[in-house]
């Protein structure tokens, strides 16, 4: 199935010059969303995943159905102040400043094999920070899966040494 035909390109969103890749037009078609999810599940099965991790918010949209299909748990990565219990945190650079991602301190057990999921790989900053959180907790990043990779932003370079699946490249 050609998944690209189900992604809507929205010019100048959220600001002029950006060609936003809208995945809601993929997700609102059950058979297409299922197909995309199944592709990631197949990839994850080969990796013997113990838990799926995804950054808010669209990492949840991809990761939760994958975790469900695999029969494993899902651990959210959230911005600072959004998780109610003790967390580990990592600060990471943005184009104009810094941001912080957090994860519950007990979300990953040492040695667990982790699949990280997100909707889109752009610069790689968010996923690099997510990897740092997983590894701080002793998890092993067995794979990283995206619906979309924006190749011209070269985010894959920040993730060298990790196994990556991108279902579509733009």
UniProtKB/Swiss-Prot annotation:
Q: Which UniProt keywords apply?
A: Cytoplasm, Glycosyltransferase, Purine salvage, Transferase
Annotated EC: 2.4.2.7
Which locations, inside or outside the cell, does it occupy? Cytoplasm
According to its UniProt record, where is this protein mainly located? cytoplasm
Recorded GO MF terms = adenine binding; adenine phosphoribosyltransferase activity; AMP binding
Protein family membership: Belongs to the purine/pyrimidine phosphoribosyltransferase family.
The record's subunit annotation is: Homodimer.
Q: What does this protein do?
A: Catalyzes a salvage reaction resulting in the formation of AMP, that is energically less costly than de novo synthesis.
The protein's name is Adenine phosphoribosyltransferase
Its taxonomic placement starts with: Bacteria, Bacillati, Bacillota, Bacilli, Bacillales
From the UniProt record, report the name of the gene that encodes this protein.
Answer: apt
């Amino acid at each position: 199935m050609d998944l690209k035909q189900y992604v809507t390109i929205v010019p100048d969103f959220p600001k002029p010059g950006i060609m936003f890749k809208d995945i809601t037009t993929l997700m609102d078609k059950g058979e297409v969303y299922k197909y995309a999810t199944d592709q990631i599940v197949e990839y994850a099965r080969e990796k013997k995943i113990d838990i799926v991790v995804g950054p808010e918010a669209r990492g949840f949209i991809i990761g939760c159905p994958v975790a469900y299909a695999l029969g494993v748990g899902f651990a959210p990565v959230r911005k600072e102040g959004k998780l109610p219990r003790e967390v580990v945190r990592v600060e990471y650079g943005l184009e104009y400043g810094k941001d912080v991602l957090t994860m519950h301190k007990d979300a990953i057990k040492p040695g667990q094999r982790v699949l990280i999921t997100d909707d889109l790989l752009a610069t790689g900053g968010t996923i690099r920070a997510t990897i740092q959180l997983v590894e701080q907790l002793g998890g092993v990043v067995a794979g990283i899966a995206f619906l979309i990779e924006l190749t011209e932003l070269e985010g894959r370079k920040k993730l060298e040494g990790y196994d990556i699946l991108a279902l579509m490249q733009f």
